[in-house]
Amino acid sequence: MGAETVTAILDTTLGVVFTWLGWKTAKIIRKYTPYSYPNARINAMEAKLLTGQRFNELAESRTLQNFIVNLEDTDYKVHLSGVTEDPLEIERAFERALASTYLLMEEILPKRVSGFFRLLLEEWDVRNIASVVKAKVRGEPAIDYVVEIGTMVPKVKAIAEAKTMEEILVILEGTPYEEHYQRLLLGEIDVDQFETELYKVYYSRLLEYATSRKEEERLILEEFVRTKIDIRNIVTLLRAKRAGLPGEVIKRHLIPGGSVKLDTALNVDDLGMALAELDSTKYGKVLRDEREKIEKDLTLVEPVLQNHLLRRMEELTRFYPLSVATPLSYILKKEREIKKLRAMAKLIADGFEPEKIKEIIGEELA
């Protein structure tokens, strides 16, 4: 083989290598660079989350007026501005703060994932529609149940003000919820099953979005959604077992798409046996660690599982620092913070002593 031939082969090989390196570098830049600014901003926001010490200070407020004043140096100031010492007004101010967080994520994140955070807002659509329709069925003032958050607030208000149940069907026309409301009107399902069907629509849309992404974005979003479904299903299962409901009734209220099978747990006799069946799932350890408390107070199940999801998102954030795991982790922390603030406002309004508030906030909602 002549020198010219060897040189030509080397040139060709080097050309292929450099082309591949250029393509690979461009792919990495295209994949990760869009997360640099938003994730840096989110990390700065995370540093401003309230500490345990700050919650202890807030617990000393004693009045809702002091509670609001003590939050004036936080990002909640803009949402609490003009709010009276009404626990419901304060609760809704915190809900607006959470909604603004979702909208900010949609605004600053890469377009290939930003739509997911818009979809997350649709959970308030489901909550609003279900709450308002339930109020209508019970003959209660439906407007009292409207929370002005979500993507369908005008429609929700129109539903609340509707004169007849049939009028609501017209308002929901063209939405993903029209079909299920029609089934409710026809008597094919009751109002509780109607709510479940709305959540099935919501989670199916989230899961469809997650599975349409690529590589780690799909991995992270899909695990997030499937875990959220698992949490809802486990909470539903355990509450139903405590109430003594049969498996076939419980099954109708479970959301498809979760990562764990609950068929065996559906057919056991009581809450303790249901928890024992869950022991073999990936949630077994976290539930086992808190089992004694959970059996006494089922409201602890959801925060225990939510904390598990948060820890998992934090793990993925460390493994994929420039990814959608960072905003998801932050959202979960923000939700937990707002849940604590809402609970604290109610406890202060109910006249609980500071030490008792610290105990409740620190233990039950940690």
From Swiss-Prot:
A Pfam family per the record: vATP-synt_AC39
Listed GO biological process terms: proton motive force-driven plasma membrane ATP synthesis
SUPFAM superfamilies with a match to the protein in the record: V-type ATP synthase subunit C
Keyword entries, A-Z: ATP synthesis, Cell membrane, Hydrogen ion transport, Ion transport, Membrane, Transport
Example GO molecular function: ATP binding
Gene3D superfamilies reported for this sequence: ATP synthase (C/AC39) subunit, domain 3
Membrane-topology annotation of the record: Peripheral membrane protein
Disulphide linkage map: none
Keyword Metal-binding listed: no
Location relative to the cell: Cell membrane
Cellular component, GO annotation: plasma membrane; proton-transporting V-type ATPase, V0 domain
Domain of life assignment: Archaea
Keyword Transport attached: yes
Assembly notes: Has multiple subunits with at least A(3), B(3), C, D, E, F, H, I and proteolipid K(x).
Function: Component of the A-type ATP synthase that produces ATP from ADP in the presence of a proton gradient across the membrane.
Family to which the UniProt record says this protein belongs: Belongs to the V-ATPase V0D/AC39 subunit family.
Protein name, as recorded: A-type ATP synthase subunit C
Provenance organism: Thermococcus gammatolerans (strain DSM 15229 / JCM 11827 / EJ3)
